[in-house]
Amino acid sequence: MSAQAQMRAMLDQLMGTSRDGDTTRQRIKFSDDRVCKSHLLNCCPHDVLSGTRMDLGECLKVHDLALRADYEIASKEQDFFFELDAMDHLQSFIADCDRRTEVAKKRLAETQEEISAEVAAKAERVHELNEEIGKLLAKVEQLGAEGNVEESQKVMDEVEKARAKKREAEEVYRNSMPASSFQQQKLRVCEVCSAYLGLHDNDRRLADHFGGKLHLGFIEIREKLEELKRVVAEKQEKRNQERLKRREEREREEREKLRRSRSHSKNPKRSRSREHRRHRSRSMSRERKRRTRSKSREKRHRHRSRSSSRSRSRSHQRSRHSSRDRSRERSKRRSSKERFRDQDLASCDRDRSSRDRSPRDRDRKDKKRSYESANGRSEDRRSSEEREAGEI
């Protein structure tokens, strides 16, 4: 891979599919079935074992670092449960590896049938010491690369002790079996990666195996599988607890409803009294509203009636004043008429005393009578007009 391709892959891993605004790369999402879920969780065997003796080639599903970055961002807000798919994938792969290991062990067992159990135990002891030495040497290399010289020196001391034990175990094993069969019993199977190991391999070769990419890759896959099992078990336990909690809540609600229905059926009077109180409170509130409305209406009516009564009283006072003025005028007129009448009567008496003295007096008397009759009719007309004005 060129430096440019490496930089592009690093940017995809950091920023996702939309780092350059390229919409064509967003046609497939990380949740698509075509995407490898083990790759999203960084545990696909095709990636881990690439470049080793057991290279599996390219995965049948899509591998994209940008999709992994998208998944890591989205998984912080939502759980997609991709651990189940990855766990199934790794379980099938490890099962195949364990099956190959068992087959290799059976093949070796067929060639070693004539070896006694005691000799097999001695050979197993030599194999164990070889594995221990190889792991210690791999650890020494790792510590030396990190610059931890003191720790690496301590581990080298342990390596020397293990080598001494190995030499003793090889000597015991060599003396316990004939030379012809000793050369045949030089292989064993690695329990981790199912690779064959020589019984008489030197320390350098054993260190290369136990510190190699193949062996470490299988260790990584097995550790990742155990981690996924633990995560899946925790999530399933959490989900079961949530389901149990929801079920308990539903059962509690059902029991509460049943208890309420039973209480209503047992105590109908109480329910009726409650309904009666509710109805009574509602009616009282309605009555209060009606009273407030009626009070407001009465206030408005009183205000209007007061204003109308004030206007009526004013008009009545005006009419009273006008009627008083009219009555005063009438009384004045009547008093004047009575004076005139008295004067006329006095004159009539004088005329009677001197009755028929002259024709001039007769004419004067007739004029007075006609004048009095005219005054009487005009007085009646005025009184009727005044009466009508008073009624108005």
From Swiss-Prot:
It is found in: Nucleus speckle; Nucleus, Nucleoplasm. One of its GO terms (molecular function) is mRNA binding. Residues 258-321 have a biased composition (Basic residues). Residues 102-177 form a coiled coil. The keyword Calcium does not apply. Belongs to the Luc7 family. PANTHER family: RNA-BINDING PROTEIN LUC7-RELATED. Interacts with SCNM1. This is Putative RNA-binding protein Luc7-like 2. The lineage of its organism: Eukaryota, Metazoa, Chordata, Craniata, Vertebrata.
